[in-house]
Every structure is written in structure tokens, then in C-alpha cells.
């Protein structure tokens, strides 16, 4: 159905899919890896990129990324937007390189696992903590991919 809806997109329109497991007031609604939907979603959906949650164990491992077709990018949501504590940069970099076993590094990106305020209530982070998360993402991305 999604492919039918976006079939006539303009050439310069970039379409992405975000797989969200819930992001209400620093809580989540569902869990489970991407394996059950990987072949259909990553192999057949006609989008340009996927924004995927990988901020904790409830997202499963990176193996389903092997199903991502060669014309798509994957944005790894490795930095949580649910908790204020900053992740260890070395741990995040190691996870990026682990994901690169399935999707080439040049087709990977880094982001928070979701937005900071998917609903009016937002998550339990101050504005300062949110900016610190964004700075962390930027710093790690510069180390891994350069400019």
C-alpha cells in the first residue's frame, strides 16, 4: 500500500520510514527485533531510507539489516531520547561498525532513536539534556564519517 501511495513522487522528494515502538513520556509501547518484517519492509518498500530504533535490547540485533536493498540508507537510532544519561561514544561507535557488517558504512547514519517530543508531553529530558544528546550524535558522526 505504501508503494502505491508514493509511486508518483517527484524525483527530488526524499521519502523515509521511521519504525517507532512508542515514545510517550519516556516510555515505549512495543518491543521486538526487525526480523519478522525485514524481507518485506527492507527489500520491497520503495523509500529512500529507514530511521530505525536501536537504542536498547528491545530492538533486536542488526542481522535483519542484511535485507536492506542496495539503494537505501539506514539511520541508526542508537542514542536514546527517553533518558537523559549520555551514551558512551565508544559503545555507539562499536555498534555502528557492527551494523556496517550488514549495510556498508557509507549508507549508514546516526541519530537519536526517536524525537524528543513525539507527543505534547514530551520525554523526561530538559532542553539542555536534549541539546547534549544532539551534540553527542554530531560528535560521533564527525568521528565516524568525517565532515
Regions found by a protein language model. Name each.
Residues 1-147:
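Domain-level signal for soluble alpha/beta catalytic cores
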Amino acid at each position: 500500500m505504501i508503494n502505491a501511495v508514493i509511486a508518483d513522487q517527484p524525483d527530488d522528494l526524499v521519502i523515509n520510514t521511521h519504525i517507532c515502538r512508542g515514545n510517550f513520556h519516556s516510555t515505549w509501547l512495543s518491543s521486538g527485533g526487525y526480523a519478522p518484517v525485514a524481507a518485506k519492509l527492507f527489500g520491497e518498500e520503495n523509500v529512500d531510507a529507514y530511521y530505525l530504533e536501536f537504542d536498547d535490547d528491545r530492538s533486536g540485533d542488526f542481522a535483519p539489516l542484511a535485507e536492506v536493498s542496495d539503494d537505501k540508507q539506514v539511520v541508526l537510532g542508537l542514542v536514546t531520547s527517553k533518558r537523559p544519561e549520555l551514551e558512551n561514544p565508544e559503545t555507539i561507535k562499536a555498534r555502528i561498525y557492527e551494523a556496517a557488517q550488514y549495510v556498508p558504512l557509507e549508507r549508514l547514519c546516526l541519530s537519536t532513536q526517536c524525537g524528543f517530543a513525539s507527543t505534547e508531553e514530551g520525554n523526561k529530558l530538559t532542553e539542555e539534556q536534549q541539546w547534549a544528546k544532539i551534540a553527542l550524535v554530531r560528535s560521533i558522526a564527525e568521528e565516524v564519517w568525517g565532515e
